[in-house]
Amino acid sequence: MRPVSWLFSGLARARRRRLQNRFQGRAFKAPVAVIGNISLGGSGKTPTIIALVKSLAARGIKAGVVSRGYGGRARRFPLEVKFDTDVTLCGDEPKLLALELSSLGCPIVVAPDRLMAVEYLLALTDVDIVLSDDGLQHYSMHRDLEIVLIDGARGLGNGRTLPAGPLREPVERLLEVDLVLINGQADIPGVRADGRIGLQPRLFRHLASNKTVAADNWRESRVVHGVAAIGNPERFAASLQSLGLEVLLHGRDDHKVLSPGDLEYADQLPVIITAKDAVKLGGPIPDNLWVLDVEMVLEPSFVDEFIAKAGLVAMDTGADRSAVNDTQD
């Protein structure tokens, strides 16, 4: 597989250079920051964007967000996503973004062509910066900043590109990006860490009644089913295990709509899902179904460095500068 991986790496480099040379001069009226990764699987992009938007808002900076809207079936794109937009039109991650950020007045636009999404958003409203949820390899879109997220637990795998490894681009691509953000506290050999993010379990939410229980006060059962249709189900299981729970993990394909068969088990133990999966649920809600809400925390020093590299000016709003959200991807 290694010769094929070398060929893939060479093609990825050639494509990047060709598109960068073609589109590098097509800047927008506001800076664009792409938040993505160079490896397959979930690394926490969506919750990181939510946390970053909140941190920027606390500093008086208004951000907008664009996304591909994977899974959305709207008849016409670009589509502005609001808190009451049907999830089937926009996809699960944009819906979650809208639920978390609508109170801040953060515009969210989806389109299969992210370039079109950025142009539509900037014609729709004025923002100080546009954040692109993924799109690191979408080189036809001009970007002023590139932020790469890496899951600390998985690192970069064997360091090889597809199909011999998990990487979409060669490791040396990290030398070209502006900031590297690691999800977790693990050190990755040969990779700099410009900042770290971390998920902290906050509370359990009973979907049928909307009752909440603080994460450290969970008394329902020590053994639970964890069901997650996200890019990295193991990270979700780790969040539950950090609370002392024994997790029967049921990972599903990313973006899958959970069916009754995914949520019903003969033992009637509590079933816990992610907030990303909860936005897609329809029909009757089982009485033993819960959502784990987590807090994503960004280091203030990373946010300050991001603002400086983007050429933005922060204002002292007197607001709390810690950014949290209740998502997990």
Label the model's feature ranges.
Residues 42, 116-120, 235-236, 280-281:
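Phosphate- and divalent-cation-binding pockets in alpha/beta enzyme and binding domains
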Residues 52, 56-57, 97, 101, ...:
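Hydrophobic alpha-helical packing residues
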